[in-house]
């Protein structure tokens, strides 16, 4: 039972050392201190992820794992673009209720379905204290059995699912068909019940396989924050067919049809550089979403930059490209990769950020051989460059001129 006294205890001790708090449990008769410690751990996990929830004193997090698996404020707000005010949305994998909360915030009426009783109770409480309970109906049910349990439910405008990507022992899984619920098996039922279906899947998933498994896919959205891929969203429509052009959206502001990359790849010779860039030129590193999308040759074509090598996903140009979807750098010097250059590299760069793309050394091996400390304002890229006389390994020394979110 979640009581006001228990919540007060949790919030009072939110900054405490948890092992010490548990050891001092005898000082707090009438309080399940171990349960409180788990709640505190869960709240700490949403402090940066869901600051509005963390700041609301009545919010409860049943277990740390539910906080780890839930959407963030960033991804929750992103999903609001799929919502039209007044529409009915079924969230069939309710969990902590973050996505239901943001759907309701966008003006949707939401049915939250979740098989775990503890999560349903927590969601009811959280929706109430967050001021959205009037827009969300909570039902304890699995996605698979919802319509058997409630056969007269009205037809939703959209169904949302975030299949569990963990096994019973809490280890991660990446195969879409191994997730629960199995959206591959359910896809026909889902599209029969709703004209639009939105599915959140692992950022490790293979996009081409997604399209094969879910042929009604119309759009794929790749969400990244701080240059790390966080989520992939698959948007399906009932009327979509296997021949439909599928658009991939990469944040920020870069989208393309899948066949565009195929056409650009067919023209790869024109997009590959054939020389070593020189100081004063610009180096471009695609953002995490672009890298995940696989739009390697289309990026070169669309932004009029040259690709270092077929397998080196870095680009360069002699002119600045201010809207490049990633990070931009000015090239300060270019060094051939050799034992001699490695030995003297730390003389010029005692501290630097290192990255490798299609390079003989890993970053760890590079640091070990040069003793270059991590950090600073210099960025060194080890990569393979296609030149007029063949492929060569080079170290491109740069300074950053722009940082995309």
Predicted regions and their residues:
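SAM-dependent transferase fold signal centered on methyltransferase-like domains
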Residues: 1-405
């Amino acid at each position: 039972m979640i009581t006001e006294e228990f919540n007060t205890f949790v919030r009072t001790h939110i900054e405490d050392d948890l092992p010490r708090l548990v050891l001092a449990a005898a000082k707090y008769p009438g309080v399940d201190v171990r349960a409180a410690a788990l709640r505190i751990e869960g709240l700490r996990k949403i402090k940066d992820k869901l600051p509005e929830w963390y700041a609301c004193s009545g919010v409860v997090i049943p277990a740390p794992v539910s906080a780890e698996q839930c959407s963030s404020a960033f991804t929750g707000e992103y999903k609001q673009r799929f919502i039209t005010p007044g529409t009915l949305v079924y969230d069939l994998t309710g969990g902590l209720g973050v996505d239901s909360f943001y759907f309701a915030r966008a003006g949707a009426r939401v049915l939250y379905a979740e098989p775990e009783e503890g999560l349903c109770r927590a969601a009811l409480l959280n929706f109430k204290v967050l001021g959205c309970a009037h827009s969300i109906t909570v039902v304890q049910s699995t996605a698979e059995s919802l319509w058997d349990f409630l056969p007269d439910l009205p037809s939703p405008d959209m169904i949302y699912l975030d299949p569990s990507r963990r096994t019973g022992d809490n280890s991660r899984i990446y195969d879409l068909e191994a997730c629960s619920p199995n959206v591959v098996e359910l896809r026909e039922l889902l599209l029969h019940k709703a004209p639009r279906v939105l599915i959140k899947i692992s950022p490790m998933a293979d996009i081409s396989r997604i399209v094969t498994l879910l042929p009604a896919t119309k759009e794929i959205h790749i969400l990244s924050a701080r240059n790390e891929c966080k989520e992939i969203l698959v948007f399906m429509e009932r009327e979509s067919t296997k021949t439909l052009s599928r658009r991939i959206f990469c944040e920020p502001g870069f989208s393309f049809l899948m066949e565009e990359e195929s056409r650009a790849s067919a023209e790869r010779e024109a997009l590959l550089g054939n020389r070593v860039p020189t100081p004063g030129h610009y180096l471009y590193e695609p953002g995490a979403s672009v890298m995940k999308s696989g739009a390697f040759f289309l990026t070169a074509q669309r932004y009029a930059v040259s690709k270092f090598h077929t397998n080196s996903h870095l680009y360069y140009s002699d002119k600045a490209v201010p809207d490049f979807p990633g990070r931009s750098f000015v090239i300060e010097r270019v060094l051939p990769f050799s034992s001699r250059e490695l030995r003297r590299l730390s003389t010029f760069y005692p501290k630097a950020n290192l990255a490798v793309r299609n390079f003989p050394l890993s970053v760890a091996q590079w640091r070990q051989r040069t003793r270059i400390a991590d950090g600073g304002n210099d960025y060194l890229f080890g990569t393979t460059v296609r030149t007029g006389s063949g492929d060569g390994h080079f170290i491109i020394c740069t300074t950053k001129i722009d940082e995309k979110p």
